[in-house]
Amino acid sequence: GRARQGSTRAPHMVGGGVVHGPKPRNYAKKVNKKVRRLALRSALAQKISEGNVIVLDDFALETPKTKTFIDFAKTLNFDGVKQLYVTNDDTDTVDRDYFLYLSTRNIEKVAAINTRDLSVYWLIKQDKVVLTKEALATIEEVLA
């Protein structure tokens, strides 16, 4: 019968609550700065030793056009390869970096980031890494 059932929201009732439902949990893992820097240094060293890092003077994109960028990538023989373009986050190059971002955001295997966003994740995820000279100088400064 219906006697002594308690609340209609009890777990054993239809429409009742969940007994041990999911709880929000923080999965973040604290990694020390020195360890994080060491990991970045070793991942970058591995990419360099494999010959997957190219340093260019500049990514000169006058207009934010994907077609222009694809032609530029073809000159580097990067068809079908996951590519990472790293630029320096200077205030002088903000427009050109934004043009690079706009030109690459619709291409499946291409990512364009600033040096402050560079992480081991990006280095492992992408096959080829293309850096500007300024970006390389900034990375050397941080990792030295």
Which sequence ranges carry the predicted segments?
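Glycine/serine-rich anion-binding loops at beta->alpha junctions
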Residues: 2-20
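Extended polybasic, low-complexity segments that bind anionic RNA or targeting/receptor surfaces
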Residues: 21-144
